[in-house]
Swiss-Prot record:
The WH2-domain binds actin monomer and mediates actin bundle assembly. This is Espin. PROSITE patterns: ANK_REP_REGION (PS50297), ANK_REPEAT (PS50088), WH2 (PS51082). Multifunctional actin-bundling protein. Plays a major role in regulating the organization, dimension, dynamics and signaling capacities of the actin filament-rich microvilli in the mechanosensory and chemosensory cells. Required for the assembly and stabilization of the stereociliary parallel actin bundles. Plays a crucial role in the formation and maintenance of inner ear hair cell stereocilia. Involved in the elongation of actin in stereocilia. In extrastriolar hair cells, required for targeting MYO3B to stereocilia tips, and for regulation of stereocilia diameter and staircase formation. Monomer. Binds F-actin in a Ca(2+)-resistant fashion. Interacts (via N-terminus) with BAIAP2 (via SH3-domain). Interacts with PFN2. Interacts with MYO3A (via C-terminus). Interacts with MYO3B (via C-terminus). It comes from the Eukaryota. The lineage of its organism: Eukaryota, Metazoa, Chordata, Craniata, Vertebrata. Residues 338-349, 487-505 have a biased composition (Basic and acidic residues). It comes from Homo sapiens (Human). Keywords: Actin-binding, ANK repeat, Cell projection, Coiled coil, Cytoplasm, Cytoskeleton, Deafness, Disease variant, Hearing, Non-syndromic deafness, Phosphoprotein, Repeat, Retinitis pigmentosa, Usher syndrome. Residues 428-463, 595-620 have a biased composition (Pro residues). InterPro entries: Ankyrin_rpt, Ankyrin_rpt-contain_sf, Espin/Espin-like, WH2_dom.
């Protein structure tokens, strides 16, 4: 009990509680958290200088005490960016600037690692920080700044130690290598163009910055390196692997497409493995299709005698195996039919018209836009061949029946979710015979009668069709199966759990070594929080070389993402975890979040013959009550928040890690996070009195001649608004401002700026609902042509995706709610009446308060 009180008081700056505990004799050097950190550490990491001085000067706690990983309070203050606490600890607390933790990191390393340029600047100019100091793995502060992407800190470190630009860690990583590995294009350009960093420098395993960028799928970095330096796409590491091997093994289809389009060659490594071997071994179907389209040989065997199909089959990737086995029986000209089976299920760019980088037909120039995620197979979907389409095409006339059956089977397999059942492609479905008698008209208000006894009953599915359904359903769930397998193997033997045990060829994936210290990642953890709930790399392990499961030489891995996704997840860091926002003031909330909603006006009379009112929709976020705001990791994005320093004063409390791309560059749905005071199903328009395309600016209580299909009614400031038609007549201009009341329920006029904010919110809501309606119509049109069982499977998948999106939006809402509550408490503490402040006044006051804190 005393431990929790002391740690909480130290973090929140409650000096009275600390005094009472000290008077009771409960503050002592033995009062440590599970990571052996004292209250002194917690006060330093929270920036509570007055509590820190009390604990050291009056409670006599050691200011230079070390936690389990060897960190002093000065390390904590530097890692969290609290310069005042760091200055006091170094000048009067007994800590030294050259003190190292168990991994050899100084306070300068930690300031660069976590992106605090103001701390780096003070340490270099006034604090005696040494930019040449190296950790146990040979990492300099400049390595940490480059991997973090902290451009201001990097410039400061380069000015004080220019020779560090090409310095290598013990596993051979340079700052440029780490910047490319993390995808920091601006840092990469600065290091090469202004600092003279060598883009050809190799790590000890032979990997270059180009290999690191390809391994992690950073297209902009790859494009810049190839375009603005003299690096070659055919460069090999010590195992003979090229950038194409790394991109294919990780499923980076966009990178693989770009490499092929710009001269990359499909070559074998020293173990005889081609990029197709790597893609098949890891179950990357799209990469296999891209490589096959571009002429990859399917019968090439590695030194162990395995083809790509053999590796895919051995590792349990049935979809890849089926694809590769089928393609083996086809000629090269028919392999250009290759398509991604999931292409129709995701938002893909239209076909560019280019079938292959090596095609000789006349094509339009490809517009490669790095800023938008394009279809990874968009350049390979079409061909000059008359048989390039897989839908509704008959086999070539001159082929034998066996050859035609192979091509037909191939086309069925390419698109299992959307294609017709085997044997029905190209054949029109005969309509059912009309009944021999006219059906009697049903009486009004009753349902149709059941079919007469003579009506033929539907036939049950036969055995082969049921087997096809099972196989297609299994293929449909391939990616889910892989994710479950990743989780199962994450605690076992790493990536090689499914690899053939007699193979000597090195895999392209890397296993994560277990972490023994989670100290820096746990700086903001509450005492009662579960330690194991935050997977990730600790600082003392992040500078160690990553060993492949069956390799003898160390291979560099990319920086930690904050979560372990499994054996095929991005390898963990050579240096440090994912990006974190600097500690301090978080971004100001949106203007729409800062004003309380006006009181609801009295509800108008309901329309005539209206049904009972629907249940009230959820309250808008502005008026919701305070929530706990408990942070949790997001399973849908595959990453967790790392290094979450909680600021006890309640001002912008959390440091959130960047959510980076996973192993694929496919577009992922993202929530827009819009907060509105309007909720409902239809567009926030009003009901017209007649079906004519004319609209009255006032709300009409007259019932519409075409009642809406939805059973809910929108709520505007607590008042029921007649439900609008789903789609207004063409040419109708909706006067949204007329829907906003001018007075609240007490009769007081609503300020004009508030009404304008409400108008903007309603307009955004209308746009969102229109877009959602359009997407639903497209989805229904696409599902209408599918069999019922396939339609149900697809709907279930879409519902799961919507549920994940809803959970993410709910988490963001809770986070915003907690942040607004903290700001309201701060305003009340400063003596302001929040209801009398405009949003810009709130921002100015909160900003001044944060500046004064430092």
């Amino acid at each position: 009990m005393a431990l929790e009180q002391a740690l909480q008081a130290a973090r929140q700056g409650e000096l009275d509680v600390l005094r009472s505990l000290h008077a009771a004799g409960l503050l002592g050097p033995s009062l440590r958290d599970p990571l052996d950190a004292l209250p002194v550490h917690h006060a330093a990491r929270a920036g509570k200088l007055h509590c820190l001085r009390f604990l050291v000067e009056e409670a006599a706690l050691p200011a230079a005490a070390r936690a389990r990983n060897g960190a002093t309070p000065a390390h904590d203050a530097s890692a969290t960016g609290h310069l005042a606490c760091l200055q006091w600890l170094l000048s009067q607390g007994g800590c030294r600037v050259q003190d190292k933790d168990n991994s050899g990191a100084t306070v300068l390393h930690l300031a660069a690692r976590f992106g605090h340029p103001e701390v780096v600047n003070w340490l270099l100019h006034h604090g005696g920080g040494d930019p040449t100091a190296a950790t146990d793995m040979g990492a300099l502060p400049i390595h940490y700044a480059a991997a973090k992407g902290d451009f201001p800190s990097l410039r400061l470190l380069v000015e004080h130690y220019p020779e560090g630009v090409n310095a290598q860690t013990k596993n051979g990583a340079t700052p440029l290598y780490l910047a490319c590995q993390e995808g920091h294009l601006e840092v990469t350009q600065y290091l090469v163009q202004e600092c003279g960093a060598d883009p050809h420098a190799r790590a000890h395993d032979g990997m270059t910055p180009l290999h690191a960028a390809a391994q992690m799928g950073h297209s902009p970095v790859i494009v810049w390196l190839v375009s603005c330096t003299d690096v070659s796409l055919s460069e090999q590491d010590k195992d003979g692997a090229t950038a194409m091997h790394f991109a294919a093994s990780r499923g980076h289809t966009k990178v693989l497409s770009w490499l092929l389009l710009h001269g990359g060659e499909i070559s074998a490594d020293l173990w005889g493995g081609t990029p197709l071997h790597d893609a098949a071994e890891n179950g990357e179907l799209e990469c296999c299709q891209i490589l096959v389209v571009n002429g990859a040989e399917l019968d090439v065997r590695d030194r162990d005698g395995y083809t790509a199909a053999d590796l895919s089959d051995f590792n349990g990737h049935s979809h890849c195996t089926r694809y590769l086995r089928t393609v083996e029986n086809l000629s090269v000209e028919h392999r250009v039919l290759s398509r991604d089976p999931s292409a129709e299920l995701e938002a893909k760019q239209p076909d560019s018209g280019m079938s292959s980088p090596n095609t000789t037909v006349s094509v339009q120039p490809l517009n490669f836009d790095l800023s938008s995620p394009t279809s990874t197979l968009s350049n390979y979907d079409s061909c000059s061949s008359s048989h390039s389409s897989i839908k509704g095409q008959h086999p070539p006339c001159g082929l034998s029946s066996a050859r035609a059956a192979d091509i037909q089977s191939y086309m069925d397999m390419l698109n299992p979710e959307l294609g017709l059942p085997r044997g029905t492609i190209g054949k029109p479905t005969p309509p059912p015979p009309p009944p021999s008698f006219p059906p009697p008209p049903p009486p009004p208000g009753t349902q149709l009668p059941p079919p007469p006894p003579g009506y033929p009953a539907p036939k049950p599915p036969v055995g082969p069709q049921a087997a096809d359904i099972y196989m297609q359903t299994k293929n449909k769930l391939r990616h889910v199966e892989t994710e479950a397998l990743k989780k199962e193997l994450s605690s076992c033997d790493g990536h090689d759990g499914l690899r053939r045990q007699d193979s000597s060829r090195k895999p392209r994936a890397f296993s994560k070594q277990p972490s023994t210290g989670d100290y820096y990642r746990q700086l903001g953890r509450c005492p009662g929080e579960t330690l194991a709930a935050r997977p990730g790399m600790a600082h003392s392990e992040e500078v160690r070389a990553r060993q492949p499961a069956r390799a003898g030489c160390p291979r560099l891995g990319p920086a930690a993402r904050g979560s372990l996704e499994g054996p095929s997840a991005p390898p963990q860091a050579a240096l440090l975890p994912g990006n974190h926002v600097p500690n301090g003031c978080a971004a100001d909330p949106k203007a729409s979040r800062e004003l309380p909603p006006p009181p609801p006006p009295p509800p108008p009379p309901l329309p005539e013959a209206a049904s009972s009112p629907p249940p009230a929709p959820p309250l808008p976020l502005e008026s919701a009550g305070p929530g706990c705001g408990q942070r949790r990791s997001s399973s849908s994005t595959g990453s967790t928040k790392s290094f979450n320093m909680m600021s006890p004063t309640g001002d912008n409390s959390e440091l959130l890690a960047e959510i980076k791309a996973g192993k694929s560059l496919k577009p992922t749905p993202q929530s827009k996070g819009l907060t509105t005071v309007f909720s409902g199903i239809g567009q926030p328009a009003f009901q017209p009195d007649s079906p004519l395309p004319s609209v009255s600016p006032a709300l009409s209580p007259v019932r519409s001649p075409t009642p809406p299909a939805a059973g809910f009614q929108p709520l505007l400031n607590g008042s029921l608004v007649p439900v609008p038609p789903t789609t207004p007549a063409p040419g109708v201009q909706l006067d949204v401002e007329a829907l906003i009341p001018t007075h609240d329920e007490q009769g007081r006029p609503i300020p004009e700026w508030k009404r304008q904010v409400m108008v903007r919110k309603m307009q955004l809501k209308m746009q969102e609902e229109e877009e959602q309606r359009r997407k639903e119509e497209e989805e229904e049109a696409r599902l209408a042509s599918m069999p019922a069982w396939r339609r149900d499977l697809l709907r279930k998948k879409l519902e799961e995706e919507r549920e994940q999106k809803r959970k993410e939006e709910e988490r963001q809402k809770q986070e915003e709610l907690r942040r607004e509550k903290e700001q309201s408490e701060k305003l009340r503490t400063l003596g302001y009446d929040e209801s009398k402040l405009a949003p810009w006044q709130r921002q100015v006051i909160l900003k001044k308060g944060d500046i004064a804190k430092y």
